Design a protein with these regions (language model features):
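Amphipathic helical "hinge" segments at domain boundaries
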Residues: 3-65, 72-75, 156-159
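Short hydrophobic/charged patches on amphipathic alpha-helices used for structural packing
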Residues: 8, 62-65, 87, 127, ...
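Residues that mark the start of a beta-strand
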Residues: 18, 135-137
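Periplasmic-binding protein-like
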Residues: 22, 72-80, 139-142, 175, ...
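Hinge/beta->alpha junction and helix N-cap segments in small-molecule ligand-binding domains
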Residues: 24-33, 51-59, 114-125, 141-163, ...
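Short helix-capping segments at alpha-helix termini
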Residues: 42-45, 164-169, 195-197
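Flexible loop/hinge segments that line or gate small-molecule binding clefts
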Residues: 78-124
Length: 199
């Protein structure tokens, strides 16, 4: 009548060969491609990936703490993240971590590094291209800039470009929040076109 308990089994293991991959958002196509590449790379090593998807509005560091207690990973890859979540609780995590898509240089943790894009510069470059080609009524779909650091950085890059070109950006009219999924983006685009048909 013995029923194995997975949590007990993992607690009993002194070492794990798993690398936890925490993915914020279940429908982000960019993250899906990154996860696939990470899994391919790890197949060539002695490690395996333990992929954990979570809602994009949840706290990734709290989830990492749970994973560290229950699964004891060798390290954690964070796909998506909010720097304020790391500032609050990351010191409790002892394994190495890597932020992917977010910059970690302002976070004071020796066991945390990052591989990222300069979202401000990239968004500014994209917006510069549109404005230099005489597009001025430009709609932007993005995440909630109060919750998503990446969305906030991209929005700031767009604003910098508008300012550089001597233009104002009307956020109420031309910015629409959405989650990082095709369905949410479609619904946001419909809302945006209803309030700004001049796009």
């Amino acid at each position: 009548n013995f029923i194995p308990n997975n949590n007990a089994k993992h607690l009993k293991q002194s070492t794990s060969k798993n690398i936890a991959v925490l993915v914020k958002g279940t429908s982000n196509m960019l993250f899906a491609n990154i996860v696939e590449e990470v899994q391919k790379m790890l197949e060539e090593t002695k490690y395996s990936a333990e992929v954990c998807y979570m809602d994009e509005d949840k706290n990734e560091v709290e989830q990492a703490l749970i994973l560290c207690r229950e699964r004891k990973p060798m390290g954690i890859l964070f796909l998506g993240g909010n720097p304020s979540n790391f500032k609050e609780k990351y010191e409790q995590i002892e394994v190495p971590g890597v932020l992917i898509t977010n910059c970690g240089k302002e976070l004071p943790f020796e066991n945390l590094s990052s591989v990222s894009v300069d979202d401000i510069a990239a968004a500014k470059q994209a917006m510069d291209y549109l404005l230099e080609n005489k597009h001025t009524n430009i709609g932007i779909l993005g995440g909630d800039i109060t919750l998503s650091h990446t969305s906030q950085q991209r929005y700031l890059g767009c604003l910098e470009s508008f300012k550089k070109h001597g233009l104002e950006f009307d956020k109420e009219k031309y910015y629409e929040n959405c989650r990082f999924s095709f369905d949410s983006a479609y619904r946001a685009m419909v809302r945006l076109l209803e309030k700004a048909p001049d796009i």
